[in-house]
């Protein structure tokens, strides 16, 4: 069974038909929409701020979703896929986005809808990705 923990008195909330792998971790101020999935070794850690996930968000194996203390929560729109071993931190990801395997999305980034962040890319703090874009590289 997945590790689901209360942090600072706040327990994660889950929509209908969500799947959590046996060793996934979801803690604190996390709210998931319907039909989300969090796969093996993934961590969704709302310990120092909020994490809001829309419907049909897919968090692949080893991915980390976190937030920034007293600065930035993390908001993820509907139909988003977070690739294996990606890190998503204190940012906004609009609907219909793919965050590629091993990509890093840093604080205060805004990823527009229908965009792709390519595998292994690093999106630096305060970057605004326009809707329908493909971002790749280090830095992207």
Pin down the residues of each PLM region.
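Glycine-rich hexapeptide-repeat left-handed beta-helix
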Residues: 1-14, 19, 41, 47-68, ...
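Compact, Lys/Arg-rich rRNA/RNP-binding cores from ribosome-related proteins
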Residues: 24
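N-terminal glycine-rich anion-binding loops that anchor highly charged ligand groups
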Residues: 27-33
């Amino acid at each position: 069974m997945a590790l689901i923990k209360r942090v600072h008195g706040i327990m994660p909330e889950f929509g209908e038909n969500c799947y959590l792998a046996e060793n996934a971790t979801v803690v604190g101020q996390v709210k998931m929409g319907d039909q989300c999935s969090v796969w093996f070794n993934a961590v969704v850690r709302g310990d120092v701020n909020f994490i809001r996930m829309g419907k049909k968000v897919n968090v692949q194996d080893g991915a980390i979703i976190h937030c920034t203390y007293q600065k930035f929560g993390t908001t993820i729109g509907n139909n988003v896929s977070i690739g294996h071993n990606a890190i998503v931190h204190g940012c906004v990801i609009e609907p219909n986005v793919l965050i590629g395997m091993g990509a890093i999305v840093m604080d205060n980034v805004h990823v527009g809808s229908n965009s792709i962040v390519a595998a292994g890319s690093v999106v630096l703090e305060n970057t605004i990705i326009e809707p329908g874009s493909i971002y790749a590289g280090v830095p992207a």
